[in-house]
């Protein structure tokens, strides 16, 4: 067996006095490289081979070694050289079986502790020279205390382990004696950063220790160094069971219980780790931790990992530390860091049988010997069995005989007689089986009712979704989904930023538990879709807004139909996603309306709005305005859902948006009216229930074609005599009253509250535009329309419709509109003016790039179709009055077919083109995208519309 090892390349024979050195070199590439790099060490070993007496006393020797250095570059070089020399010596001791396994990992731990403290002390002196000395309020010097976690704290460090550290200092304060005073927190942060660099940075000399700071409070998101008070607050208020588990092995490096700071820190942490009562609640937390590791083993194919695999080191630690967490508060003999020292106490307390303790101890030593040999080969942190014959031979040689301590703490030789790698594996499997049996007896795997592939996948997501999420772990999970490799980084950064931000929020225990269950569902579902990059940021934004509102999180987690619906909405509409994120109260719609996609009837908008506002006092105007916006957003959401789910056709979508706007206009007028009447009284010419005021809608609202982002084109009219006035104590003229009413209506619409702006209102279509009065009498309006209006203003009147007013005022406006539209016009002049106006619009509005088509402004688009409809009305209404009846384009084309103005083919073709293009605009509105598409879309519709346009306007020029 031993003959398989390679001793070539060195001037050494495999016999005699050089045999131990040959064994050390053959067993470890690291030792060989260290001897090649450090000639003085090689010379020392050739004069005198390492012995047990050479081990230890690291701090004193290192102090001498560092006494001559002047800067951090030299510090880095010396630390690495010293570490490599001592590690090579311990590898020699291990390879030649000169000491017990326990001795080796105790020495590895002592070496690490000495190096860390020496580096800290040297850097502390340097930082004091640069920044001053940190002191508390009493002027007492404040030290940096370092807590060693894991195997370092338990004095069980393996050969090439990383080190888990937590930095802390006693009290806040400032530095003294430096060029510039800085806070203690800043001083210790800088010191900590320089210490990590001194240990962790890979230089030409290698590294000292891979340094992991993620076990500190808040992990990577937390401060690098915390005061005692901040640490105490964290562990009392936010400390979790896995942190208690980790703290079992915590040790203050350089521990000195005569030091008041050391005593205080230890007394502060002990109650967090060890509860005064039997803490059976820890079992489930530990079980969940183990299940998480088991899933990681499967996910990363780590079954051969001697640390994480079944029956490995981690399960042995779980068994022992579970007893420590449950019983350690009451049975203080369990409050020890070393696993091997705790085992006999578990037997004394009848928590383990002697045989169980022996099986666990033997398996632990066997695994630790195997782990150390594996890592000593190349100074690499590995726990996976090798596949090559050379390294397998090294392992078999090291593990077929080794020393361990017996029950009397005396060296005991353990021997195996393997002839093959399979025999070694059989012994390993036997140890692991012993551990596995005990683990299942004592802790076990709680029966999982639904171990379906989906639930397994959700569990894996739950494992990796934490503030310290790792990109490689995420990539391993994403490989099971139809996610492009080039998108992995985008998803990682999105998740990392989100999860880190959430970790700093006061979410509470209940909320965090719900989030931990919800997020795996979200990620599994979204990553299973093709539009994951669209949906994920939008849905995360919604969840982000409700992280501190646990009720909403529970709604998303518990109601199975809501999350898929939200994902679908987010995929189809950024507008909807942003509305829900901005106003989370819209999620109430999902609770109240189980059939959210069923919108109400048109006539119900007014009655529902009235009922919605009843609960708010009339005098609370701000609350009323807020409620109006909430009502609009809630129903806008329901309409959008119906649109996205295909419940309503495009024409009905616009109808609902139009009726919703009309209901809101009515309530806005009511609010403004009551406010004005309360201040000034009402115009005296009015009867009891009259207001003498009308709101005329133009554009898309007038044409019953409102879109999601449409503004409201409004004109205000009244029927008051000019000489009249109001009836209040502060009487004003009728004109002033209606002017103030119009201004008040405008201010309500445009007021920006926490619920957003109600509607953008455009009043430029009133007589004389911006130069005209904000509100006109019916008589003045009629005169202007029939004697002064430009052709484009009369075109706009085609889409005019009274959306608020008494029946008599609605009739009056309809009469004015009808008589105006039915005036006879010269065909040639009319077509020329409309064509010229369209040409001006095209020149000023169309800025579409090559290869694109603007659905609204480009030739063959919506504007051309609208102009065709308006042209037909203005040209033929004097002959066919029914052409003046409708304000919407579709019914205008229907009337034109019925009157014989358009053929069935042309009329239906225009309606089809109009509705299809409108539908596409709706879709783009939902995505908050401009109304621009690729010019390969709507080719036939554009050609048809352009052909009709030319027939009407070009061929007749």
Swiss-Prot record:
The terms under GO molecular function for this entry are:
[glutamate-ammonia-ligase] adenylyltransferase activity; [glutamine synthetase]-adenylyl-L-tyrosine phosphorylase activity; ATP binding; magnesium ion binding
InterPro entries in UniProt: GlnE, GlnE_rpt_dom, NT_sf, PII_UdlTrfase/GS_AdlTrfase
Cellular component terms (Gene Ontology): cytosol
- KW Nucleotidyltransferase (keyword) present: yes
**By its UniProt entry, which HAMAP family does this protein fall under?**
GlnE
Which PANTHER family does this chain map to? BIFUNCTIONAL GLUTAMINE SYNTHETASE ADENYLYLTRANSFERASE_ADENYLYL-REMOVING ENZYME, GLUTAMINE SYNTHETASE ADENYLYLTRANSFERASE
Q: What is this protein called?
A: Bifunctional glutamine synthetase adenylyltransferase/adenylyl-removing enzyme
Species, as recorded:
Haemophilus ducreyi (strain 35000HP / ATCC 700724)
Task: Give the source lineage, highest ranks first.
Answer: Bacteria, Pseudomonadati, Pseudomonadota, Gammaproteobacteria, Pasteurellales
